[in-house]
Amino acid sequence: MTELDTLKSQLMSEIAAAADEPAIEAVRVSALGKKGSVSELLKTLGSMTPEERQTRGAAINQLKTEITDLIGERKNALKDAAIAARLKAETVDVSLPVRQSPTERGRIHPISQIVDEITAIFADMGFSIAEGPDIETDYYNFTALNFPEGHPAREMHDTFFFQPDEKGERKVLRTHTSPVQIRTMESQKPPIRIVIPGKTYRQDSDATHSPMFHQVEGLVIDKKAHVGNLRWVLEEFCKTFFEVDSVVMRFRPSFFPFTEPSFEVDIQCDRSGPIVKFGEGKDWMEILGCGMVHPNVLRAGGLDPDEYQGFAWGMGLDRIAMLKYGMPDLRDFFNADVRWMNHYGFRPLDMPTLFGGLSV
């Protein structure tokens, strides 16, 4: 056996014996590093005759190539083995039932649950979610929504105003989520189908009102949108949201500056017990307001009302949560009472889906 064969056999044994990546790296350095055994052999080529260099050099280079390949293969094998061992050690059997803790920790707030339920319903209808700032300009909160300066309808909102800026203009805490309609029309070309959940602010506080409350509204803009489409959307929403097979609704004429015609929508229900039951009974419950988007609002959004039309609707999230889940006092939503949350809250893993059930 020649010197090269002996060295090759020795290195192959060391490579095979390397049990981890640091060990195989040590073998590489001892063989192919600057002072490695194979590198030292390559240094001897300079003192050889051309004839010796031709035969000896080819053999040494072949040894270097073989050892390099073997080290690479061993390194990859060790890396794969390390990954497999780590995966095995960190594997969680997801088929096992979750162990109940002595006390359940954390609950989803009913408002968060309601937002997830409503957005899941409208997402299935092809709507996207739109959001906007809580602090708005007078223009987006009032003027662009057909509340001109001095319009008596502005008195309907007890608004939180900020101090005037250097130009004398005052911003407001938005009194409704409708400013997002204008911002969306300015930035997006029709067709538009959006649902807008968010916080709103008015100076009011009692068992059914709060200075900060939540709204959700929807907007559809297209060339052929009409009241029939609006009615279908709202009926499908109510059936799915209240988890009933059918609903009876009535549309009463009303007034909103940003829609024409405008309607208040009532849904038939049974109010004889402590919890309102929808889809049955002979009572009526008002749940939302809606209407066809006013031409002035379309113009403010940069759209031609002779070409486009649309419809919109809006409702209070807090109130509709109270109706669906039988919560008597709106102020409890914001008291941070752990006992109330344990009673009315939802488990974190119970995400609402149309297939699994909205309020499981």
UniProtKB/Swiss-Prot annotation:
It is found in: Cytoplasm. SUPFAM superfamilies: Class II aaRS and biotin synthetases, tRNA-binding arm. Its EC number is 6.1.1.20. InterPro entries: aa-tRNA-synth_II, aa-tRNA-synth_II/BPL/LPL, Phe-tRNA-synth_IIc_asu, Phe-tRNA_ligase_II_N, Phe_tRNA_ligase_alpha1_bac, Phenylalanyl-tRNA_Synthase, tRNA-bd_arm. Its cofactor is Mg(2+). It comes from Agrobacterium fabrum (strain C58 / ATCC 33970). GO terms for biological process: phenylalanyl-tRNA aminoacylation. Tetramer of two alpha and two beta subunits. One of its GO terms (cellular component) is cytoplasm. It catalyses: tRNA(Phe) + L-phenylalanine + ATP = L-phenylalanyl-tRNA(Phe) + AMP + diphosphate + H(+). The gene is pheS. It holds the Pfam family tRNA-synt_2d. Mg(2+) binds at residue 260. Belongs to the class-II aminoacyl-tRNA synthetase family. Phe-tRNA synthetase alpha subunit type 1 subfamily. Coiled coil: none annotated. This is Phenylalanine--tRNA ligase alpha subunit.
